[in-house]
Each structure stands twice: as C-alpha cells, then as structure tokens.
C-alpha cells in the first residue's frame, strides 16, 4: 500500500510523471478516473485552502467526498485517534487525507487503515503536497530548466512544515536554497543561512515567503508583527524590477509577509499556486488510489 507521508515517498521520476498529468488537469475539466471511489478528509487543525483543494481535486476526478467535522466527531468526545481511524477504515474509503497538529500522526494512521493515507500537514514535520505544488509552479514558470536556480525561503522556517518539505524536495531537482530568518526562526539545518534579506535579493530567482506561525510560539518573539515586517516583508522597495517570482503557501499576512502592491504584481504566483494545488492533488489521489 502506497501513502504520501513525506516527499520522500515519491521518486524523482514519479514526481515528474505526476507533473505531466497535473499539467493536463489544469484545464479544470471533470474526469471519471475515480468514479465509484470515495475520499475522506479529516482535519484536526483548521484549514480552508488545503482541505478545499483536496475536496475539489477528488470531486473533479469523480470521487465522492466525506468531510469529517472534527469539532462534531467522536474524537472531540474522548474517542482516541486510532479508534476514529479504525471506524473510518470500516467505511472502506478509497483514501484518507489527514491533517494534525502532532507530527507523525499520518504515519501512525497508515498502520491502522487499509487505504492510502495522504498527509495534509502534520505539526512542523511535513506538508508534501504543498512542496509538490511549489516545485510544480517553479518548474512550469522556468520551463523545467530549474537546475542551478536559487531560492530564498524567508520567515518562520523553524516552525514551518512547508519549509521542511521543500528543504527535502527542491535540492533533489538542483535548486539551491538559502534560508533567510531571524535567529529564533532559523532551524538547525546544514544549509546556507542569513538573517538579512537584502544580502540575497540580488542573487535569487525565487522568493518563498512563509507565514509567521504565532500559534506555534510559546512566547512572543517580536514586539509586534510590524517589527518583523520591517525586516522580512517582501515589498516593492525590496524587489524593485528584479526578474524573480514570489511564492507563499498561504494564508498570506498582507504587509507582514508580502506587501499589498507585491501581491498585485505579476511576479507574485500565489493564486497560480492555488490553481496548481488542485491539479497536483488530483494527480496524487489518482496515483495512490488506482495503484493501491
């Protein structure tokens, strides 16, 4: 049984095949590949973009979707996560998409179910479909000539599962990463690092801005988000007319992560990422369900 828990679960060749199929899915036309199949989504953390994206992807493939409302489920009444998984599995879904605040939950659930598990984000650990859609967006923009391209990942890297997955995936395709963050947001990771965004802005082809994850901070690290923005907001004054693209996994804190004028700039690919995300998740669900 194949699962997607981290980006390591797919080889480079499999990823390129996914991208080829995802490109076809960008036409947004309905398909029947998963007719008669069902996809269950169970999100123990709030999500608008990711959960909606997976549900849209499943429906476009012809699958039925069961969205489990965790706030009303038995898990909120004391049922263990594993009992919830066992009960879901008894309904014989074709795949389960799970998000949880604790790292490792999707991996553990894979031992209690008999269908593919797709990790929709677990703690600070991984968000594989986000990294796949980020790479797909980069690949499409640069016509798949990405070896040697340089990316700055900017912001709350230490607490970001998106960053963790991109740190695993992007170098596999020859993309050079520099981490840009204040010391308390910087992970202990053997890679190029700087605390000053202006030091790298002239050298990069891509900027990936990350949300400041205040919900994962035990104590405040800045007096205000405005103070953080003074050093790390992606603004027009910073990027000027440079030939680069800007990514963000969402939700964007406007004028904290990215300024309003940059959000409206054609170099900002945030909405392209959203569109690409549905296509990538269609390709992932099709692959895992039909190969299981």
UniProtKB/Swiss-Prot annotation:
Catalysis performed (reactions): carbamoyl phosphate + L-aspartate = N-carbamoyl-L-aspartate + phosphate + H(+)
Pathway in which this enzyme or protein is active: Pyrimidine metabolism; UMP biosynthesis via de novo pathway; (S)-dihydroorotate from bicarbonate: step 2/3
Binding positions (L-aspartate): 77, 161, 211
InterPro entries: Asp/Orn_carbamoyltranf_P-bd (IPR006132), Asp/Orn_carbamoylTrfase (IPR006130), Asp/Orn_carbamoylTrfase_sf (IPR036901), Asp_carbamoyltransf (IPR002082), Asp_carbamoyltransf_Asp/Orn-bd (IPR006131)
Name recorded for this polypeptide: Aspartate carbamoyltransferase catalytic subunit
Cellular component annotations (GO), alphabetically ordered: cytosol
Gene3D superfamilies in the record: Aspartate/ornithine carbamoyltransferase (3.40.50.1370)
